[in-house]
């Protein structure tokens, strides 16, 4: 099981959830049963968010180099990099990439891509919005 942690400078990293290595399913840590968020296809690197009805395609991690691309409007955008050691870096144009967190016990780069889209990205985006309001 890949445990997903968000990096917090100067503090212990925050446990967000887990990625199942056999299925690529992602669960957010909650009180009581963990919440199923979506999945990463281990053979293709495609990431899907769980929805009622068809799942939503979010993007893909390339399994040969760990580059993560977001599928939004227009062409896919390079948004992150997953390293073989489980570390995940958010892409910043014309600046060093930000270290966002890690997947401990990662078996596939697809697990890291799923952790980025389904666990790390929502938390990072929410923190950026809150910082802008404060």
What does each model-identified segment do?
Residues 1-24, 30, 44, 51-134:
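Long terminal segments
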């Amino acid at each position: 099981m890949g445990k997903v942690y968000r990096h917090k400078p100067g503090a212990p990293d925050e446990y967000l959830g887990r990625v199942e290595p056999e299925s690529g399913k992602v669960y957010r840590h909650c009180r009581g049963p963990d919440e199923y968020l979506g999945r990463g296809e281990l053979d293709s690197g495609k990431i899907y968010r769980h929805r009622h009805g068809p799942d939503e395609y979010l993007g893909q991690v390339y399994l040969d180099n760990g580059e993560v691309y977001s599928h939004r409007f227009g062409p896919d955008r390079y948004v992150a990099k997953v390293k073989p050691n489980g570390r995940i870096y958010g892409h910043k144009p014309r600046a060093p990439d930000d270290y966002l967190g890690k997947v401990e016990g990662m078996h596939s780069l697809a697990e890291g891509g799923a952790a980025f889209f389904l666990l790390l990205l929502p938390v990072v985006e929410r923190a950026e919005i809150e910082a802008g309001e404060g």
